[in-house]
Amino acid sequence: MAVGPGLCEGESAATALRQAQGGLPHSIGSALRACALPLSVLWPIVAGVNATVTQLTDQLIVSYAKVGGINHLDGKNLPSKTAIAAITIDLLRLLFPGFYDERTIHSSELKVEMVSLMDSVLGRLEDEIYKSLEYATPEGLAKKELRRAAKEMTVDLLGSLPGVRELLKTDVDAAYNGDPAALSQEEIIVAYPFVEAIAVQRVAHELYRRGIALIPRIMTEWAHARTGMDLHPGARIGTHFFVDHCTGTVVGETCLIGNRVKMYHGVTLGAKSTGDVEQLRGHKRHPTIEDGVTIYPGATILGGETVIGTGSTIGGNVFLTTSVPPHSLVVFEGVKMRVLNKRERELLMVDYQI
């Protein structure tokens, strides 16, 4: 049963559902009694539902009262994940005209297409930013000023797109110059998941640094699900950034990454685990990677005080929690590799079956 806005007066239906303690007549009845419409109108809606469905629903409603913290009832509307996903795709269309469109866009119609798309994104993104500001209102901003602030932030964000495009061009250049398998820059934009991940991160970072809640993280987690690369919107990333293959790579919120940094799949730039998380919020927890660093697959670099010096190379599977000076080569020597000939293999062969 759904009880929509405008039906209830006084105590909302959602509040009544949260207070449910007993069986179906109590929980559903409490919600219905909170509504302005008479029970004679609303009760048949519930009574006519399959008994199994109502029983399962009531069990879930009771859990809403027992298990708090994961409900969002009676609060302001949160930004919509579905809407933000659609907006993000349209932002990619603005950043890479012609690459995310189903039909060819000719130069003669580019302005008409982009004006229409920009207008659509402006209105929809403003609505989502307004929801974000309602959810987490910046200090000193009155409720009556939220719509104006949302519009200004949206215009400001869209005004940053030319600068974001300049950064993305350096990323595409770095990918082309750093991967001999790349046949063209068009192939990189169309086929490399890294480009989508870094494009979304760079736009989300613009929202993040303006203090807009929820939306930046929704955007980058959407890209994470599509590309396998987890770039936090708070990370500050320089020019000519490239992550080859990119699957499983994680870059944390307070990372500082310099220019011309190249990484591979499975790299983690993370924070050290601690028992007192609250003391770490708002502080630098993730490493600094200086200019010209290369980090090979599977490397893990942790800690806010860890600095990887300019021009250093971090080998595969290295685990680092301390800084290294510029132009260092860090390799993992904990396990020796052994190559066996055919006879040695036969002597060591173990019959193993599942």
Task: Describe the residue ranges of each PLM region.
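Short Gly/Ser/Thr- and charged-rich N-terminal loops/segments
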Residues: 1, 14-21, 31-33
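Serine residues within intrinsically disordered or low-complexity segments
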Residues: 12, 27-30, 40
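Terminal amphipathic alpha-helical/low-complexity segments used for targeting or macromolecular assembly
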Residues: 42-221, 346-354
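Left-handed beta-helix
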Residues: 227, 232-233, 238-239, 244-253, ...
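Regulatory activation segment
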Residues: 278-280, 284-285
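C-terminal membrane-proximal segments flanking the terminal transmembrane helix
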Residues: 301, 339, 343-352
